[in-house]
């Protein structure tokens, strides 16, 4: 895999608070190699290591995007949800930012059935068919459509399993990480100082609680994806 320059610099990461970890009492000893110091009861992540792994992740997604591969970005906690959606939309990736439904990937046939139902309901609403139903029936279907939009809206165009999954919070999205491991789908994961760096294919040590930190990491990754997509289009 060719190494490229992704303009990842330490001052920018420091300004975004990427280096701030959890309290020293709430940590995973396996994160020791990625921690550079303790400050006021908080672990500080080694940003040189963060930059290295983020650069590797950017190289990986660039290469995948340049070959037309698909991506899924997962981050359902409140601080990550908006950044996940905007980053995914910008790079034309699928995303889950509300709730991970168990079996979303490992039981893909069920997910596919839900997606077909979701698309059918959206089509009926767009054609005005729901407004012709009795009020009670229309209200029930609109509630169902709203729920499907919340949970499946980010994957409504997904027609098969993703080639790479990017996960914002390892602890919060552990179920998604497990499903990827079962299916052999490569994962890129933001890991804070309370995480296990061995669970993802590429683990990026970073603050997964600060919006600015999450946004910075995602911006670098989706920029690399977009560059890869341009390369793919140019080579077709």
From Swiss-Prot:
| Pfam families assigned to the protein according to its UniProt record, in alphabetical order | Ribosomal_S2 (PF00318)
What CDD domains has UniProt attached to this entry?
RPS2
Q: Which PROSITE patterns match?
A: RIBOSOMAL_S2_1, RIBOSOMAL_S2_2
Q: Where is the signal peptide?
A: none
Keywords recorded for this protein, A-Z: Chloroplast, Plastid, Ribonucleoprotein, Ribosomal protein
Subcellular location per UniProt equals: Plastid, Chloroplast
Which superkingdom heads the taxonomic lineage of this protein's source? Eukaryota
GO biological process terms, semicolon-separated: translation
Q: Which GO terms describe its cellular component?
A: chloroplast; mitochondrial small ribosomal subunit
Give any GO molecular function from the UniProt entry. structural constituent of ribosome
Which InterPro entries did the record assign? Ribosomal_uS2, Ribosomal_uS2_bac/mit/plastid, Ribosomal_uS2_CS, Ribosomal_uS2_flav_dom_sf
Respond yes or no to whether keyword Plastid is given for this record: yes
Say where the protein is mainly found: plastid
Q: Which family does the UniProt entry place this protein in?
A: Belongs to the universal ribosomal protein uS2 family.
- The protein, known as: Small ribosomal subunit protein uS2c
Lineage at the top is: Eukaryota, Viridiplantae, Streptophyta, Embryophyta, Tracheophyta
Q: Gene name, please?
A: rps2
